[in-house]
Amino acid sequence: MSWIKEGELSLWERFCANILKAGPMPKHIAFIMDGNRRYAKKCQVERQEGHSQGFNKLAETLRWCLNLGVLEVTVYAFSIENFKRSKSEVDGLMDLARQKFSRLMEEQEKLEKHGVCIRVLGDLHLLPLDLQELIAQAVRATKNYNKCFLNVCFAYTSRHEISNAVREMAWGVEQGLLEPSDVSESLLDKCLYTSHSPPPDILIRTSGEVRLSDFLLWQTSHSCLVFQPVLWPEYTFWNLCEAILQFQMNHSMLQQKARDMYAEERRRHQLERDQAAVSQQLLREGLQASGDAQLRRTCLHKLSARREERVQGFLQALELKRADWLAGLGTTSA
């Protein structure tokens, strides 16, 4: 089945969608697509068929999101923990991924028409090399599209993502691109796999399980969490509407306020750190007792500007390193 399932909503679906759109709408929804194996057991089919039906439901859900004006979707496709499953199931999932990413490369016209940028987030080194190459082709082919975004978390856990971001910052310090004092929560944000995306407004988990399973733990601290009992392959447009309605009724205004307060708290902490560093600098230079407010402001501005220059240089180097790795995959089989 296609990644992009085209088609319009029914008359009744459009009517309800328009009612929803009268309220605050999420810009970014994340899904834990749980229940494929239970669906297969329920329908007395092979597990692989359950996973295949789960992919078909993803294509349908992306169409609903597009029709509702939700322009960014992140899905938990394969956890690093899933490698602990039986070899036959893991091999089947890798084969399914090969089929779907190969199909993706055949759908360039649809992707271009809808402006869909595909990002694959996770430790791709853990995947078979041929699958890495297919993923790299898909990411490169769609990287300049910007109407809507699909983030596929594959070989991913949040703990792995955060520890990788810490390693990237340590690399920046080792390379002389950063000072140890440049390391902060804000910089860690920019080193995550999701650095180009806003935090999800809603995180939806299907199948009735009430846990996050190590998915987007850093990014969802202020997200609306919705746990729904339906198995993923049986997910419907109405389940999605229910989740959006929960967001509108309980969370949307508080969410933005909480994010603004948290951002302000980060800025305040950074200012306090900068003020302490300037005080130490003036003390070393024998100017602490001068009490010159203009001098302190000048020093603060210079300190902030130098840090921002280092951080931007580091982030550019990090982007280049990641892009070079993807480009290298494209030439592996050549």
What are these model-predicted stretches?
Residues M1-A334:
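Flexible, compositionally biased loop and terminal segments
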